[in-house]
Regions:
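Active-site donor-binding loop signature of nucleotide-sugar glycosyltransferases
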Residues: 6, 118, 180
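Walker A (P-loop) phosphate-binding motif
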Residues: 1-50, 152-153
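Hydrophobic anchor at the start of a short beta-strand
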Residues: 30-32, 112, 175
Length: 182
């Protein structure tokens, strides 16, 4: 399992990262995506089909299914249950990408990719409802990779160093800086 998550509310680029991981890893693996399916009106485990309604499965899982029709896409609010169902119903799947699952402690991914918004540094943020943090910054020790998104085109080296110092808690962690191009 590769988990793509964050510790804040709001868009940090998890879905575009999930799409990039699926596109790359599908060359070597039979990949599935597991999402909670935010905004859906249903509960429990559902597989996303090309003709699924976004109200039933969520807009982002449907978007991914339409973009990657050969990828198994499922939604389940209980991620451990969702992983078990995917494995049972699709024994050929050998890699599951878990979208927005960093807070789910019942699952221990092989790789945790944590997305960080450069415009909202975690060291200056507070827990909900006073801020945008939905997990403690101390939990970042579980991350393997940090992808800092929305970086300015010319990010100062000192700003990169400060972010690395804030984020890296154990020696194996790596930080990557990205920006959107229009």
């Amino acid at each position: 399992v590769i988990c793509i998550g964050n510790i804040t509310v709001g868009g940090t680029g998890k879905t575009p990262m999930a799409e990039m991981v699926i596109a790359y890893m599908s060359q070597m693996h039979r990949v599935a995506l597991l999402s909670r399916g935010y905004g859906r009106r249903t509960k429990g485990y559902l597989e996303v089909k090309a003709d699924s309604r976004y109200r039933d499965v969520g807009d982002e899982p449907l978007q991914i299914k339409l973009k990657f029709p050969d990828t198994v896409v499922a939604v389940c609010e209980k991620r451990a249950d969702g992983i078990r169902r995917i494995c049972a119903e699709h024994p050929d799947v050998d890699l599951i990408v878990m979208d927005d699952g960093f807070q789910h402690r019942y699952v221990e991914p092989k790789v945790n990719i944590v997305m960080i918004d450069a415009t909202r540094p975690v060291q200056h943020d507070r827990m909900l409802p006073l801020g945008t943090l939905r997990d403690l910054p101390e939990e970042l020790h579980r991350a393997h990779y940090f992808v800092v998104t929305k970086c300015p085109e010319k990010m100062a080296p000192i700003d990169r160093r400060i972010l690395r110092k804030v984020l890296i808690q154990v020696a194996y962690q790596r930080v990557y800086f990205t920006r959107f191009e229009s």
